């Protein structure tokens, strides 16, 4: 059964897929936004009293990286940030990422 979508839903953007999992009793979860194979332009605004991030500095203007392959939004502190590693492994298997000549490196800020 297809879930109902609404105008403005991120899943209505061509080439974007979203997945989510949570553990309600542990009060944590993870959302993954996958971009089309060639990636998408990313941006970031880090806020909060004790934010934890991974690879978000890559998104600053003027850096070598122009596109991201996925974005991971997670809870659970450092363990939540490690979820980006699993997304990177998946994207590597799918041959997605920045072409470094000898390999493709998936760009997955969290």
Question: Language-model segments: which ranges?
Answer:
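Alpha/propeptide regions of enzymes that mature by internal proteolysis
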Residues: 1-110
């Amino acid at each position: 059964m297809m879930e109902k979508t609404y105008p403005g839903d991120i899943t209505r953007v061509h080439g974007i897929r979203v997945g989510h999992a949570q553990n309600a009793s542990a009060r944590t979860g993870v959302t993954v936004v996958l971009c089309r194979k060639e990636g998408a332009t990313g941006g970031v605004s880090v806020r909060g009293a004790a934010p934890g991030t991974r690879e978000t500095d890559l998104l600053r203007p003027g850096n070598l990286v122009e596109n991201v392959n996925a974005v991971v939004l997670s809870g659970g502190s450092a363990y939540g940030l490690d979820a980006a590693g699993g997304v990177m492994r998946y994207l590597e298997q799918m041959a997605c990422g920045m072409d470094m000549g000898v390999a493709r490196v998936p760009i997955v800020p969290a």
